[in-house]
């Protein structure tokens, strides 16, 4: 059963969480203040074309991947890719001059533009349901970590939810409902909750979630990784109608980053390999590709274009 109003679990932490796909999957990077925050390990973003037989995306053995193309030329942290609805550009986080800002890459022209340029740090860019703003996890000047929005037309940013902190990651369910990864207090586990912007009420879902929250294609559900034990991580589905969770499939060992294709296939990466599975068909993970591109190793985050014809893959560059 869900537990409502877990406001007692939220406090302003002196340490905050910065997302780093290049750390071990369970790791978190504390940063007492933006000025003293350690820089996450470097990472690059690649885009890869995805083709399927007869345009179906329900069978992994019918998929073919093109050659990866690196879209980030800045040596440092380039992470958290997010495809815009038209599939023509990608938002991502990049740390430059010790500050994390949001950038936008145009796939057709290859041009990169800066979206945010603030003294604070912004992470996890996501287009809001109104399609006029992007929401971000913002590390404020005092280290507070909350959800903000930036207008796409360049207007001033504003808080989305004042009282919820510290936010690690988020997913828009609809125009007034959010799934939120909340950092636990000292000695307490991180937890996952739903938050209603209209009622200002929270609904507790589970402890120890993974950082990736995704809508499941063509279902009234969203997915998350449940870290049940150090050696047992499962991808679960939360049913928005029944308010219950059910296991879909075990995650690859030590991996918490994943993505859905529109046809219902799950993707996960490990080292230089990309794996796929159709969990609703009761199948197991199979290797889809082993990339041989120099520098493409340590795959972590994966994003899928709206049509499912292109992937954005985060990888660790060669040392």
Residue ranges, per PLM feature:
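Bacterial N-terminal signal peptides that target proteins for export
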Residues: 2-13
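Bacterial N-terminal signal peptides
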Residues: 12-22
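Sec/Tat signal peptide C-region and signal peptidase I cleavage site
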Residues: 23-27
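Sequence signature of WD/YWTD-type beta-propeller architectures
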Residues: 28-319
């Amino acid at each position: 059963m869900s537990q409502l109003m877990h406001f007692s679990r939220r406090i302003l932490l002196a340490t905050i969480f910065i997302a780093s796909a290049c750390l071990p999957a369970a790791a978190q990077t504390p940063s007492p203040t933006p000025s003293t925050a350690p820089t996450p390990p470097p990472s690059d973003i690649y885009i890869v074309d995805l083709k399927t037989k007869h345009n179906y995306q329900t069978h992994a053995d019918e998929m073919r991947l093109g050659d990866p193309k690196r879209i980030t030329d800045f040596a440092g942290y380039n992470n958290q890719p997010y495809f815009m609805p038209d599939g023509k550009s990608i938002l991502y986080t990049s740390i430059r001059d010790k500050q994390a800002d949001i950038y936008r890459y145009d796939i057709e022209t290859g041009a990169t533009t800066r979206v945010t340029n603030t003294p604070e740090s912004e992470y996890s860019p996501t287009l809001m349901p109104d399609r006029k703003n992007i929401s971000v996890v913002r590390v404020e000047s005092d280290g507070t970590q909350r959800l903000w929005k930036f207008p796409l037309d360049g207007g001033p940013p504003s808080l989305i939810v004042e009282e919820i902190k510290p936010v690690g990651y988020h997913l828009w369910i609809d125009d007034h409902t959010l799934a939120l990864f909340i950092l636990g207090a000292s000695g307490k586990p991180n937890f996952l909750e739903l938050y209603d912007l209209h009622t200002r009420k929270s609904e507790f879902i589970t402890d120890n979630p993974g950082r990736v929250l995704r809508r499941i294609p063509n279902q009234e559900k969203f997915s998350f990784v449940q870290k049940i034990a150090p050696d047992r991580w499962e991808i679960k589905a939360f049913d928005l109608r029944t308010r219950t969770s059910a296991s879909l499939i075990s995650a690859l060992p030590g991996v918490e980053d994943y993505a859905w294709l529109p046809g219902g296939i799950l993707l996960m990466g490990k080292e230089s390999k990309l794996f796929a599975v159709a969990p609703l068909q009761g199948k197991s993970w199979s290797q889809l590709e082993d990339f041989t591109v120099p520098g493409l190793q340590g795959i972590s985050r994966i994003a899928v274009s709206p049509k499912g014809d292109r992937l954005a893959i985060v990888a660790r560059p060669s040392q």
